[in-house]
Amino acid sequence: MEIVIGLLLSSLSLYCDFTDAECLVISPARLVVKYGDPASAKCTSDQPKQLGWEATHGGTGLTDKKVKFLNWSVDSVTDWNIKPTCYTEGGQCQKQLDITVYKLPDSVSMTGPSGPMVEGKEYEFKCLIQKVAPGNSLNVSFYKASAIGRKTKTLLYAPDVPRQTTKEPISGEYPLLWSPSRGDDGAQLWCSALLGLGELGPQPPPEVESEPFKLTVHSCSGQAAGSAMVAVFLLQLIHWL
C-alpha cells in the first residue's frame, strides 16, 4: 500500500512540475536586440491567471483581473543584463525571456610596421576593437587583397577570441604574426569585427572593418643589390681619398 501511495505522489509531483513549466509561454521565446532599440514580448497562460512582468525596464505589477496574456515592451533597451520574467500570482509559475543585447564596436583599427618590410621576415600586426557586445559573439579576421581592390580578398588569419561571461561591451587587441612575400608589395591588409548572433540576429551578420593598411615590401635580392652598390661606392670613395 505504501508503495502504491509513493508511486501516486511521485506521479503527481512529475505532473505538477510539468504543468508549472508549461503554464506560461513567451513569444518570441528569444530576442536579439540592438542596444537602444525597442523590444517587446507576449506572455500567455494556459488558464486565466493574474499575470505580471518583472524587469529592470518595462516591468509591471500583477494584473487586477485574471487574464490569459500580458505584453512586455520597452521603447529602448539600455540594460545589458536585462532579464524580463513573466510570473503568476504567488510566483507559482514563472518564465524568463531569453534576450541578447548587442552593440557594434565604436571603432576597429589596425596597427603594423611603420616602415617598409622585407620579404620573408615576420612582422606583428594588431587589430584594435573598441567596445563591442556581446564578446562571446565576436569573430575577428585578418584579410589581404591585391593593390587593385578588395574584390579578391583572402582570409589570412582568424585569431581565437576568448569566450566572455560578461554581456557588457568589451575592448581588445588581437595580434597577427605574418611574413610577407615579394608579391605582397602594394597589397592591402585589414581586419574586421563580426558579430555572429545566430538565425535570430541580423542577416548578414553585422561587420565593421578597419581602414586598409598598405604594404610596402622590399625583396631580399633588391636589398642585397643595394647594399652591394653602397659597398662599391664606399670602396671607391676610400680609394679616391
Q: Language-model features: where?
A:
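Solvent-exposed loop segments of extracellular immunoglobulin-like
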Residues: 47-57, 131-146
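Solvent-exposed loop/turn motifs of extracellular immunoglobulin-like beta-sandwich domains
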Residues: 2-6, 33-38, 65-68, 75-87, ...
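Core motif of extracellular immunoglobulin-like domains
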Residues: 43, 53, 86, 127, ...
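N-terminal Sec-dependent signal peptide, specifically the hydrophobic helical h-region
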Residues: 1-31, 35-37, 41-59, 80-99, ...
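Extracellular/luminal immunoglobulin-like beta-sandwich modules
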Residues: 85-105, 187-218
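Short beta-strand segments of immunoglobulin-like
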Residues: 28-33, 111-118, 130
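Proline-enriched interdomain boundary motifs that mark the N-terminal boundary
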Residues: 20-27, 104-113
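Solvent-exposed serine/threonine-rich low-complexity stretches and specific carbohydrate-binding patches
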Residues: 57-72, 152-167
